Every structure is written in structure tokens, then in C-alpha cells.
Amino acid sequence: MTEMGHRALIAYERPDSLYNCHYSHWGACNLRLKRDITPERPFGGDRDNEAARCLFDALAEATTDETVNRVLKETAAPQSQVDQHPLVIGTTIETIITEHLDYLHHEAFYVVDAEFEITAYRTHWFGLQYDSRTIEHAPTVGNGALRTVRWYDGEPVGDGFAQGEFRALKAVVGEMVDQGVFSPAEAVEYMCKKLDAWAGTRDEILVRTPVER
């Protein structure tokens, strides 16, 4: 049985402007990877490691799974916060957030650009099956919103409040669906509008729903 964690996906920009997507089992906790990923520690960790950097550079150039497997076999990098074996290589952000990111089980998503500037997003799942008696199932992949978090002095500001705010919103919306005020589609539309209003001009909101695909 897989140990519960604080799961995250990380998209690393490649020299060809595409992305490699990696998984971290604990990377969403306190959005720690925004601090822990650096050019010297591309997969996180407590200390700089040249082998990890060489592995990262080689993976950034890989174009086939065979190359990935060979590079991983040949490079003895230490264990790290981010799984070194990529889930997918040479893809786009759009593909990751619509086809790979699980908005229920992945608590965070990071985009690491070529200069190692990192954008951290919290995930908000639109599924209401745990908040409504009349909804039995909702997809978890490609069905939610990504929301940036404000930072001050290296720490996320208002992260816990924002998560609680969205949980409370879902509880209210789920009840409104049960009362016939909203259809499931109208419920998602309402949640999107509330997120946009809360974000204002400070935060970035990215929304993906199955209807869009």
C-alpha cells in the first residue's frame, strides 16, 4: 500500500522549450520545493550534488524512453525529494495540466523555467462527490483549477486560508446542487467565478475541465 503523502507534479523546462514532468511524494508539503529546487539541486535535497545536476541536464536532452532509462542506469545520483525518473518527457504545460495532473490527489504543481525561476500552484479539484448527496462521481484528472500563492520572505502567505476558503466554497456549492439551485455544470461555473474574484490581480488562476478537452 502506498504511503499517503503530499503529492506534487513538477514541470521542468527543457532547452527545446518543452517540459519534462516529474513526481514528488512529499513535495506539496508547505510548497517546500519552491525553496528546495535550485540549479545545484534540481531534484531538491539538503546539499548540492554534481551527479544530480549531470543527470538533470542529460534528461533535459532526452527524446526517447530508451535514452531516459540508459541515462538513469548510468548516473548514480543520490535519492532526492523529486523522483528522478520522469513521468513524461518533451511535453507541454497544457498537456500536463489536462492529461496528467490529478486535481484531487496532487496537492501542488510547480513550473521550473530554464533559469530555475519557480512558480508554485495549489490545486483545487472541482469534483463534488464528497460535498453533494446527488453527485456520485467526478473525474480527478483535468478537472480543477490551479492557483498561485503569494510569497513573503521565502514563505507562502495565506496558503492555508486559501485552501480552507475553497473547501468551504465546495461545501456550500454541494448543498446548492442537492437543493436544485445549481446543475453540476453551473456549480463548476460558480466556483470558477468565485476563484477569479478571490484571486483578483494578485494571483494567477488556470482552469481545466473535461468539457474543454
Question: Model-predicted segments: where are they?
Answer:
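Acidic, polar-rich N-terminal leader regions of halophilic archaeal proteins
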Residues: 1-213
